[in-house]
Amino acid sequence: MTKSAELFAKAQDKIPGGVNSPVRAFAGVGGSPIFVERADGPLIFDADGKAYIDYVGSWGPMILGHNHAAIREAVISAAQRGLSFGAPTETEITMAELVSELVPSMEQVRMVSSGTEATMSAIRLARGYTGRDKIMKFEGCYHGHADSLLVKAGSGALTLGQPSSPGVPADFAKYTLTATFNDLDSVRELFAVNKGEIACIIVEPVAGNMNCIPPVEGFHEGLRQICDEEGALLIFDEVMTGFRVAENCAQGYYNIKPDLTTLGKVIGGGMPVGAFGGRKEVMQYIAPTGPVYQAGTLSGNPVAMAAGFACLKVLTEEGNEKRLADTTRHLANGFKELANKHGIPMVVNQVGGMFGFFFTDQETVTSYADVAKCDIERFKRFFHLMLKKGVYLAPSAFEASFTSLAHGPKEIEATLEAADQCFAIIASEAK
């Protein structure tokens, strides 16, 4: 038995399921999860000392790679001045200014401590601003574990085979309308039936919680137009895509201006940080300037702000956005070419520094219904074969994978060499 397996067995005695976030338990792929001891650059090292090329990146935040010197030094410096004050700091201002500079639609920014907190707060704000109760989301999209957002959710909810969660009262769920991702007709139909009742549409601009699904042409433009016509707010949940798809986020990449934006993951550089922001007119409805209440003991934590600021400054240095996208594109194209070589039908999607692959005969994968048709068992087999060869992909067919600026030609070629061997095994097993 490996040390990771021993630790997993031990953890289950005191921690529900042995983990503190469900997808980490390998429920979507089977077997025991690896327990990580340390990480550096593009690599993680498990409790047995084995190294893996990491394409999970702490589920997105580690865009510079693990243990980056600039972030580490910023954290140490900030920690030496105190861990938390419960009072405003200048660092919060500089961080908000940088975010607004990079994401112009975020004229004002409120810092929080997680992506879930950001989306939950943004929706409360949208409801308060519009005076409407209903919200619209998309099947398979995940926006955190707030009650109203776990209706037909993606991510861990899909991995566990639960498109919605027990414990969410029916009275909450009835205010959440679910449309089909990449299908504007389904959006229009819901607005027609709920005229004047919908406060907002919340959407992942690239759906990353049912693997990786980009928008079809015209989808986001259509959402913007519909929201304008119906008096609803458009919320881009950029917790995953923020600063990863492009330095101006997915909204910059697709040239769409949402009313509100939520951020997380990359914005903290590995520390627990979230944020939401948007038009000043809307943000002024948040307390203390407005009636919509939102607060947090650790919001704007000085150590977390220092980490996030350092991360964004390095990330936005000239050439880094292109290098990250080029690296990810090379890897994604390599997966597709190797799958074709071995006669394995596969769809590979990639945007910026995120990618996903689907074992399927379909020509495209554009919605949750398409994802549900994919060969999950083949994904599980491929995941474990790659893991044995020292490549750590997202342990769920419903999760996107990520590269970092620390991933170089050496890591990409090693990954593709491993994939070539794993595809060969899978192809031979199918004969």
Swiss-Prot record:
Its EC number is 5.4.3.8. It catalyses: (S)-4-amino-5-oxopentanoate = 5-aminolevulinate. Coiled coil: none annotated. GO terms for cellular component: cytoplasm. The modification N6-(pyridoxal phosphate)lysine is found at residue 265. The keyword RNA-binding does not apply. It is an enzyme of class 5 (isomerase). InterPro entries: 4pyrrol_synth_GluAld_NH2Trfase, Aminotrans_3, Aminotrans_3_PPA_site, PyrdxlP-dep_Trfase, PyrdxlP-dep_Trfase_major, PyrdxlP-dep_Trfase_small. Keywords: Cytoplasm, Isomerase, Porphyrin biosynthesis, Pyridoxal phosphate. GO terms for biological process: protoporphyrinogen IX biosynthetic process. It comes from the Bacteria. SUPFAM superfamilies: PLP-dependent transferases (SSF53383). GO terms for molecular function: glutamate-1-semialdehyde 2,1-aminomutase activity; pyridoxal phosphate binding; transaminase activity. It is found in: Cytoplasm. CDD domains: OAT_like (cd00610). Its main location: cytoplasm. Pathway: Porphyrin-containing compound metabolism; protoporphyrin-IX biosynthesis; 5-aminolevulinate from L-glutamyl-tRNA(Glu): step 2/2. Its cofactor is pyridoxal 5'-phosphate. Homodimer. Belongs to the class-III pyridoxal-phosphate-dependent aminotransferase family. HemL subfamily. This is Glutamate-1-semialdehyde 2,1-aminomutase. It comes from Aliivibrio fischeri (strain ATCC 700601 / ES114) (Vibrio fischeri).
